[in-house]
């Protein structure tokens, strides 16, 4: 719909045109002016009534759109302390089975199995791969009790009369507990029947700094490292060298060194090898212009040859026509001469 402006009159209702009175034609030319013409009068715009209807827009409230967040339910696993106790029981039972299967030949090795078992129980709580959540206080208490038990076992073992074998002791190669050895001591190798796997795991996990501070357990920890019979013989003959060997083993027991990535190899052309291929020469703008000019000349020559061929063909046509005309003239002249005679 296109709205048009309609002039407003007071006497007539809106949107109704006033009737136009046509006068008879006169001799004078009518002059249109804004006074005597409706078209040139002052036009007033039509007023459009405002909309009376009301629209109620119902927008959803923000409270309905808010989704309440759900808190995740934390489930406390009650099976973890049971697993720790199961690991301890397994260590104790395996130590007892190893003692039953392989009886130790020396009394000293049999007596040292008790502090070793206590040390295995001590390190089993540290060697547990799954940390105990919520039982930190109980774990610390059990560790303290186990360390106290291990120290009591070690003190009782050395107080009963068992000594430490030494190659430089004055009386029978045995020193009483509490006296220092002038040179580093070397204990006999463990019997193959006795298993020392919990102590090895403790050494791997704890290292040297985290071992207990009691002298008996320290010496047991040193004895737990695997040794060959040849190495034992050399250590008995030369104790300072054995100490150096132990320090070398301790250095090697640290974290493995990370190898740095090797840089990529750069291939170079030697004298014996062939040189790299020569690069193509880059054409200068002058050479490009010369090449374009030569191409244009070739095109012009080709065009000129075509034109010349056309011209020659035309010339040959004209010559042929001339020859034909001459022949006709001769024949006409011969006919006229024969008729005159």
Curated annotation (Swiss-Prot):
Renumbered residue ranges of the record's region Disordered: 72-131, 216-283
A Pfam family assignment: POM121
Superkingdom per UniProt: Eukaryota
Biased composition (Basic and acidic residues): 79-101
Residue spans of biased composition, Basic residues class: 243-252
InterPro entries: POM121-like_prot_1 (IPR043220)
Comp. bias (Polar residues): 108-127
Family statement drawn from the similarity comment of this UniProt entry: Belongs to the UPF0607 family.
Protein known as: Putative UPF0607 protein FLJ37424
Native source organism of the sequence: Homo sapiens
Lineage summary: Eukaryota, Metazoa, Chordata, Craniata, Vertebrata
